[in-house]
Amino acid sequence: MSKEFIRKTKESKPVVAICYDFDKTLSPDDMQAQGYIQSVGDEVESFWKESNGLAEENDMDQNLAYMFTMIQKAHGKVIFNKKALMDYGAKVQLFPGVETWFKRIRDYGMERGVIVEHYIISSGLKEMIEGTKVANEFEKIYASSFYYDKDGVAQWPAQVINYTSKTQFLFRIEKGTLDVNDSGVNDYFKPEDIRIPFRNMVYIGDSDTDIPCMKLINSYSGHSIGVYNPKTKDKRKVYKMMEDKRIKYYTPADYTEGSELDKLVKTIIDTTASNEKLMAVHYINKQEQVSHNGQIDNKEDKEKEKLSMDLEISHRFKHTHTIISELKKIKNSN
């Protein structure tokens, strides 16, 4: 029997989707380095050196390599099941203000007539993220995960997410087709029927792995924010991302009320509330014009849809970059 997918439909109010990387965006360090690596008697630096070496020597995806290395290192040392991974996740530290951030921003949105939804798009482990204190704050967690045998022991990757495949989840969020196996993400939607337009998306990340998502969101007038550790104040990565036009803004990863990030995101929500009123008028005018002319010229919409589908299955950065550039041309021609 085929699975019946639950899809989110367009709301009567505008929706803002805030999408987050996890490691070094919501947490100061890689999640694997906050308990798991130490439990198998390894050093953090040597673990990543071995994992990345495995990937390089075998033309292997780096994320598949770290997942394989985790399974191998656990043999005979620790139980490697979902509960154990969630327990490691419970130990993961979060940046200041993260625990109260999600509700606070949702509440602010409601005061402005805007629905705010939070999403994770991470190459880290879903099971560990599900073990954190904030797991229930997200509409959906898109992250790498394991397949478990009948005894509950991790055997094989069930899902792996790398820096280029991250972009497909933005399209799922855009259309409300959140299940990873829902082919409805390829369906055509009229612009006025899109649940969360890219212009109403915010992507918060810290490094190169976030660039494809940031670039895609930027190309459709969305909002990309680079964050850096507020303790070290090392801004080299955000400076580089700003120079390369990957981000529009950067702030410390301080999620407390009144922080730079707090004020910035609230300003984006305020802007969205005003802009969507204008867009509603635009769509009404457009529908009237189409009705008067008796036909719809949706050539550009169809071309955008084709490029979007190509982007969803792209696994190479160069190909992803080319597709996003073509999408941007369509946007700029409107």
Could you say what each language-model-derived stretch is?
Residues 43, 81, 132, 197, ...:
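Helix N-terminus capping/helix-initiation residues
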